[in-house]
């Protein structure tokens, strides 16, 4: 039913309703009445008709008058079931007022107009031109930027210091391998990369017949303790190197006599396989020049067993040699002939304060060999501890020297705290405790803690700074009592290490194209004289007696 039919029906209904009272009027009018009453009756009828029409216009509510704040009558009528009618013309006007956008066909027609086509092409051209411009700029930046140097090939023993424990009983209160295992966490705090243990095998002095490489001396511990030590060290990121020097307690030499070298090396080869299968990460041998020259074929086999990886042992193992030679030329020749991964020598002569000799030896070895094969140490099983060799006042100076030279530093146990030899080369290790101490002992304890803190700071910086790990070595200044060198790597910060061995102050005048005028103090053996983070003049660098300092300055291109 359409709208017009609905309107007609409603109009017919209203006509019938209005006709009923109209039909009653003639009946009343037919009765005789006075003229005045007739006029009154007609007025009443007119008022009644008007009232009825007004009531029909009001909504069907429960009665009563509509309050003033009530909604409009039309809204109430819709709520009470009344129908609000709209003619077609009004609907068309409302639809025209509500714009809902273009449909698909209209959009396609508009998009195909010349104006929009030109706009799209212009925006597309701008986009691709911008993209190509950014690409070209990126390529130009890459081409013009300085290339980073490729990192050198290094091994785990080049990443930090090696820590030697030559006497297990002297290192801890437990006096065995279990006690050493309990101190691994303390060694980890020093950022050492390797732990050199022993010798711990059975080897009565000068008795080649009683030699047993594969048996642990009862004084050192047992196989289970050694297994626990290796596992704990590996968890802390520390590799374990085993000292297998044959005659380490005798006086006839580390390899006994020349006639017994062949017999000893044959037994050593089987022992190497045994210990490498136990998880050790390398082997140290003293007197390598003797075995390499007397039985070169046997020495080649030893090298192959340790240095060549297998499916069972894919990780790289280190072969460390030890020699008593001190001449830089002899050490360089031996390093080439033996083929060891590291060679510990006496190039840095104990007690020598000749800075010019130190500089010459370091420069010769550095120029002849890769720094990944160089090792620097002072003291050891045969020589004793650093503090006894150079004096307590120079311990920090030599710590700085060992940890900043190009190569691997090798530290004897206790050197980090300035431990002194007491009647023998294996003094008892001193560990910090909370027990009450008198004045003198308190001062000694404070000095040990200061020395250890200095070593730890140096070691931490060495393992994370590329110039100190594998950077180039440049000699800046050297005299009979002072030395300064530069460590640089690519675009990293530059480090200057300066030393004064003299008993009086020295002034170093460091200048050159690679040096700025100012540098920042990183560490100093005398922090009150050269505090950390202070600025110094490199052209007028003053060092006190026995003082050393590590400085840095930024890369400037």
Region roles according to the model:
Residues 255-257, 303-434, 489, 497, ...:
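Conserved alpha/beta catalytic core and glycan-binding cleft of carbohydrate-active enzymes
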Residues 188-192, 215-253, 263-264, 271-276, ...:
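Substrate-binding cleft of carbohydrate-active enzyme catalytic domains
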Residues 174-188, 260-277, 392-401:
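Short, acidic/polar
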Residues 189-192, 277-281, 288, 340, ...:
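A structural motif
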Residues 1-196, 202, 214, 219, ...:
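Carbohydrate-interacting/catalytic domains
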Residues 200-206, 244-257:
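Aromatic-lined carbohydrate-binding surfaces of glycoside hydrolases
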